[in-house]
């Protein structure tokens, strides 16, 4: 996440739009402050125009406006859309409560009747496009509700149906823009962290997380200098942390995975 400034213009080098805005507000609310004093958000609605061979569709998170678009094809398409929305929202709640926000620290945490049953209910065996076809019959609308898997580089024709959560999130929670760009959110987090007594060390490369006896974190190797510590929160990608940062035996890493 960074910003490029040129000739009075600002460009985000990473993501620009925000989905699920409550996640961005939560660190500030949890630390006892009003997030509006740190950053501003603006809802984008409609959040995109989709141009098909036949017409232009304004994609909106306002259900009344969206209903008009679907009903302009056929009333049955709106009924199918509501069935789709109900189905994928129930899967989202299942995934969030039983998988996304749950820690799996051992085999028994996953391999039990309750968890396996919840995994089955996600019904990820069909592709995203096939799942949409069950409820929405018009070709334009099928493509309209399925291309969002491309956000994460997955084809709707081969990716599992669970990725239909992405357009559902857009439609239910809306699409938002942080005023000043996404980098403004990083500055807001920095400000609040420092207010709480935190210290940020800039322009430093973490080379290794030192683990004593393959059991306990004892330090960080930063710019070829050892810094003592007894706990580390690694925000890098998990595979990168395991293969490049964690200084411990490979067989111990396998057990952590």
PLM regions: where:
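Beta-sheet entry/capping signal
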Residues: 49, 56, 198-199, 219-220, ...
């Amino acid at each position: 996440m960074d910003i490029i400034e040129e000739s009075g213009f600002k460009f985000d080098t990473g993501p620009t739009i925000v989905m699920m805005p409550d996640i961005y507000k939560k660190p500030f609310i949890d630390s006892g402050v009003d997030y509006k004093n740190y950053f501003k958000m603006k809802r984008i609605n409609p959040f995109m125009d989709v141009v098909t061979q036949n017409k232009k569709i304004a994609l909106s998170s306002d259900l009344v406006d969206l209903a008009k678009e679907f009903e302009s094809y056929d009333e049955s398409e709106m009924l199918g859309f509501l069935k789709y929305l109900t189905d994928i929202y129930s899967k989202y709640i299942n995934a969030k409560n039983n998988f996304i926000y749950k820690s799996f620290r051992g085999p028994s945490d996953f391999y039990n009747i309750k968890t396996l049953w919840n995994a089955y209910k996600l019904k990820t065996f069909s592709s995203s496009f096939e799942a949409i076809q069950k409820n929405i019959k018009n070709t334009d609308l099928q493509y309209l509700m399925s291309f969002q898997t491309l956000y994460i580089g997955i084809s709707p024709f081969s990716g599992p149906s669970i990725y239909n959560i992405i357009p559902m999130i857009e439609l239910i929670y809306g699409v938002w823009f942080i005023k000043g760009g996404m980098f403004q959110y990083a500055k807001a987090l920095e400000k609040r962290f420092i207010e709480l007594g935190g210290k940020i060390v800039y322009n430093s490369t973490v080379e290794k997380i030192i683990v004593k006896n393959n059991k306990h974190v004892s330090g960080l190797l930063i710019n070829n200098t050892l810094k003592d510590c007894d706990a580390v929160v690694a925000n890098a990608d998990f595979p990168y942390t395991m293969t490049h940062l964690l200084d411990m035996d490979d067989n111990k890493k396998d057990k952590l995975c």
